[in-house]
Amino acid sequence: GKGWKQFKRWENFIEPRVYPQGIIQSGQLYNEYLRLELSNNNFRMLPPNVWTQVGPDNVPLEGSGRKRGIGRLNAIVFHPSDPNTLYVGAPAGGFWKSTDSGQNWNSSTDFLTNIGVSDIAVHPTNPDTLFIITGDRDGGDTYSYGVMKSYDGGNSWQSTGLSFDISSTYYKGNRILMDPINPNVIIVSTSNGVYRSIDGGDNFTHTFTGINIVSMEFHTTNSNIIYAGSKGSTSVYKSVDNGVTWVQSGSGLPLTTDVRRACISVTSANPNVVYALFGNNDNGFYGLYKSSDQGDNWTLQSNSPNLLGWSTNGSDSGGQAWYDLALTVSPIDENIVFVGGVNCWKSLDGGINWNLNTHWYGGGGANYMHADEHMLQYNTLDNKVYSANDGGLYVSDDHGTSWTDISDGLHITQFYKLGVSQTVQNLVIGGTQDNGTFLKDQLNWDAVIGGDGMECIIDYTDENIMYGSIYYGDIRKSTNGGNSFSSIAPSNNGSWVTPYKLDKTDPNIIYAGYDELYKSTDGGSSWNIITNNETGGSRMDQIDISKSNSDIILFSENANLFKTADGGLSWSDLSSSSSLPNKTITGILIHPVNPNRIWLSFSGYSSAEKVYFSDDGGSSWLNISGSLPNVPANCIVLNEIDSLETIYLGTDLGVFTKDSTSNWNNINNISLPNVIVSELEIQYSSNKLFAATFGRGLWSFDLQITSSPIANFNVDDSIFCSLPATVNFTNTSSYSNSYLWDFGDGNTSTSVNPSHTYQNFGNYSVTLFASGPLGIDSITYSSLINISSSNSCIVTLPSSGQGNIQTACNGTLFDVGGPNGNYYDNCNSWITIEPNGADQITLNFLDFDIEAPSGGLSYCNWDYLEIFDGPDTSAPSLGQYCNSLTGSP
């Protein structure tokens, strides 16, 4: 509670970057970006491959069909005359614009120095003129380097007179407003007070210093009056001279020492009215105050229930006021008020009484809306109300009775970690901040684990086995391709992002780093500790295991590096070497053939301390940082099939590469946004390098193919008893990039992973041709598909709803997980058995395995098979069957 997760997110982000001095050096990132822009090899590589956006494109769906969330937004602003044009700002994902009410989105800030956006201002009569204040108001994921201006509707951006010297300051940009009467006046609030321009942003004056102003609004009819709410020295401040001078507003407000943060809202329904929302020092609800005389006098409207907590009735304490605090008032009714914190509450009487409007998981009978509201805003053109929150953007056109997620198309996901399949092309799984773990299976993204998603792995021999995790090392495993996950974690807590890896020759062996290194030899069913307090109770950050000798294992904790050569019986401290920097280790690489060759990557801003190499097993180290920029390196990966030992490095300024014959080159190639790269992985079957970014989603890059193609594939089912028969083909080819399928029935396809429907009985051979730069390969499976009315049917239920009509029923019926998997939670699905010409059906169960009744009950209270006497589930029920309660209807 009380913003714990938000703090841990920030700590995880900032700690490796400032270790060990604890000094934020945001200016270093800016300086290195400028240096890269001027360098000859900036954004260039031969051949000039480009990065491709992988997604998520649309908001990933949970098993219930509900949208999980795509990424955090700070701001929502509107066009002055067109209600269909919307602008949003993402703290790590940039400026986005929609001209069709959120159906489609485009961004134009990918190559700014820093793409974080805290707020946006639009000219009241010339919407081609816009301003953004850079950075992250609420979370600190990005720093602010000042205000940018657009003259072409947000297509391009230029610097203004307000730019922060980030080599010596670390300011947060919070709000930016344009005077609706005189648009040459620009008011900007920051963590260091208020700045004012009277010439359209060419020059700024610092008019209010030393106060962190996080909320700010103009009076709706008199632009000389501006209200501001602060965070720290918390109160409401007011200017009556258009932002030139500021004073604490009126009487009746709480003491500044009693409150943590304030938020302001005004309404055109009554220009004299202004509301102020306060969070207390516990980050819960302190009170809502109202002034009806332009802020001269204030009245407490309510101080309960706790509008900023997690519960459905406001009976809890605390909240996240320091991180999410939002307030808006209807432009047509001064008494309709919305408050946003973790959830959203609504009042119809000016904030005296409250009803829960939305809840972070849909509890209490309220609508579901993603947690953590950062801005609530009414559009005065159509009276729709919008929420910018940790999941994206929501809109209500009925004053909050219902809400719609319109975040599809916002590529703003903040990935922590990534796992790729080596058997199925483009199958990936990734852990994200705020929105859980996402699985991409071909074209679709699904939300498969909640919480904050962390490290992910897909078994390199079986794509149906995959792993995800949430904070502090709660590792989850799926054996059915991500349909369901269950915890396999040992009883310990790890780092916020806990490292774990599969053994590189036996995927049933798993290593997980907590304060001790745990090893499982049975896929996570049981664990043993193989260290002896080497970290002194501190938690591990990185792990790697030798592919050629699994007894050789390395792990790190901050700058400390440990190694075993005997499977954990004894450990040595490699960090005692004076040649290694005292910086957080962010990546460990052991060569797949020669375990004496080891690479390390480091975070921090120290000059030329990014990558170190050892060719003697860690006894000595060579600094190979070369021309790398002095910014944090976050991950490192080796191309294992490249004889030149090509390595790729993910940094706060994109991706760099080098091999044994070259120095470092940046391969952003004017296509990868200027964003933090948090993890890199190579998928050898597709020959792609995948980059998980912290703010712009997942990207891929085609690597040079150095081997001849190898064609191969598998199918989900090959024996059918009825028509039509649909087969899903999974391409497992390597070193290839184009394909031709011959399904044996006169039909072909060039899709990577096609689905084909056979219309006639028979046996069919299937051939796949796989082409690549170094040739073509083919494979044929003779008589692979067998369709005959005499076959025994093997039926797998759909994930939900109605499946196929079965005209023959001698065989096996599996739940959605198949023979070895688990079904979804709350899964209701069915098939219809309808043999041709039959007027009666007898079902004999030869083997039956469904969960038994619990709690001593004599009926099936959880999972069961139910049979209906008719064509659908509205027909009379013939009985429910589970485990010992079986029979033949």
Give, region by region, the residue ranges found by the protein language model.
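Extracellular/lumenal mature domains of secreted and surface-exposed proteins
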Residues: I705-N791
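Beta-propeller blade termini and top-face loops
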Residues: G1-I705
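A short, polar/charged loop/turn motif at coil->beta-strand junctions and beta-hairpin connectors
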Residues: M45-V50, K67-I70, S707-P709, L723, ...
